[in-house]
UniProtKB/Swiss-Prot annotation:
It comes from the Eukaryota. Belongs to the cyclin family. Cyclin-like FAM58 subfamily. It comes from Xenopus laevis (African clawed frog). The keyword DNA-binding does not apply. This is Cyclin-Q.
Length: 244
């Protein structure tokens, strides 16, 4: 019995790892399609969050992830008031999956796909109980960066791309489900902490201060939470090297 249990656990782990990689690739698809559609960073983040949240309620076997992704993009555009035409979403996504191809003809296949996107959008709304508006880390990170820039040595700040790195880390975090497992303030602090670490930049007087700089920004956060988020980010980048 123990051998059978171990085999089942191994199969479950392999299946889970496969699912994580699929979600990674589909999240990248959402991000790249979003950029081609001219979406801003917050609507793209909302689309990724809707996608990840939807698959917390169901499994990949039940719904086509690329259809869910297109519907998430369409819905996110409405939520964030950056409305997108289904025709544009369909054509951008079609070209993403079929590089160099011509736009789809407006025929029965096109209208069937359009109807599927709309029906999937309604399904997602029902499954998520119409809770599709989210607080993202973006506004917190912007505030923290401005505060830290005024706090730090100007030369140290200007010679290292801390802000650029922090924004890139935040964007890449949406390849996984960090947005569902941590508070937005925690993610904002963690990506900033990681960016500072990457460039070896120290926050002035932090070692002598009674309160660490990250607790000034988010008083409930701990170094353990920061390290857990960084560990998850490193796992995302490791996965990126493994996925062709």
């Amino acid at each position: 019995m123990e051998i059978g249990k171990n085999n089942m656990d191994t199969c479950n782990m392999a299946s889970s790892d496969k699912d994580v990689k699929i979600h990674f690739k589909v999240a990248r698809f959402i991000m790249e399609a979003g950029v081609k559609l001219g979406m801003h960073s917050v609507p793209i983040a909302t689309a990724c969050t809707i996608y990840h949240k939807f698959y917390k309620e169901t499994s990949l076997e039940n719904y086509d992830p690329h259809l869910v992704a297109m519907s998430a993009i369409y819905l996110a555009g409405k939520v964030e008031e950056q409305h997108l035409r289904t025709r544009d979403i369909i054509n951008v996504c079609h070209r993403y999956n079929n590089p160099g191809s011509e736009p789809l003809e407006v025929d029965s296949k096109f209208w069937e796909l359009r109807d599927n996107i709309v029906h999937c959008e309604l399904l997602m709304l029902r499954m998520l109980n119409f809770r599709v508006s989210f607080q993202h880390p973006h506004k917190y990170l912007l505030h923290y960066l401005i505060s830290l820039k005024n706090w730090m040595n100007r030369h140290s700040w200007e010679r290292t791309p801390i802000a650029t790195a922090a924004w890139a880390l935040l964007r890449d975090s949406y390849h996984g489900d960090l947005c569902l497992r941590y508070e937005p303030q925690q993610i904002a602090v963690a990506v900033l902490y990681f960016a500072l670490q990457c460039y070896g930049v120290e926050v002035p007087s932090n070692s002598n201060a009674e309160t660490s700089w990250w607790q000034v920004f988010s008083e409930d956060i701990t170094i353990l939470t920061i390290n857990n988020i960084i560990s998850d980010l490193i796992h995302i980048y490791t996965m990126d090297t493994e996925i062709v």
